A protein has these predicted regions:
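A short Gly-Trp-Pro
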Residues: 1-125
Length: 125
């Protein structure tokens, strides 16, 4: 099974081979500021990810151990990349078709915005 996706303008595209891991929803202040709200993503082993349009992919070093990838044309936030790890997180909203996954965890909930509640019954950390 291959999952495909892209940024809003299509300048950056990607393919993931195989099944996707269940996504989590990050409520940290960095993800909220970059995405505009919570950020749902799935962790994918690097060797199963192919990115096209890398010349349009910009990286922002958001902390000493993590960089965030976004399209330099449309600004879509696509990737959360801890280079020392064997996986990279991909934005769930960037996939072209339904993924068949279900949210399995809310993370950094202590940092969540005060304008919403989490009431879906999914575990929180």
């Amino acid at each position: 099974m291959t999952h495909t996706g892209s940024c809003l303008c299509g300048a950056v595209t990607f393919e993931v081979e195989g099944e996707l891991n269940p996504p989590d929803a990050c409520h940290c202040s960095q993800c909220r500021k970059q995405s505009g709200h919570i950020w749902a993503s799935t962790d994918v082993p690097r060797d199963r990810l192919t990115i096209a349009g890398e010349d349009r992919l910009s990286w922002y070093q958001s902390s000493p151990k993590v960089r965030r990838g976004f399209c330099s044309v449309c600004g879509s936030f696509l990737f959360w990349d801890p280079p020392a790890r064997g996986s990279i997180a991909i934005d769930m909203g960037a996939f072209d078709a339904p993924t068949g996954t279900h949210l399995h965890l809310h993370i950094f909930t202590a940092d969540k915005g005060d304008y919403y509640e989490i009431g879906d019954g999914v575990p929180q950390k």
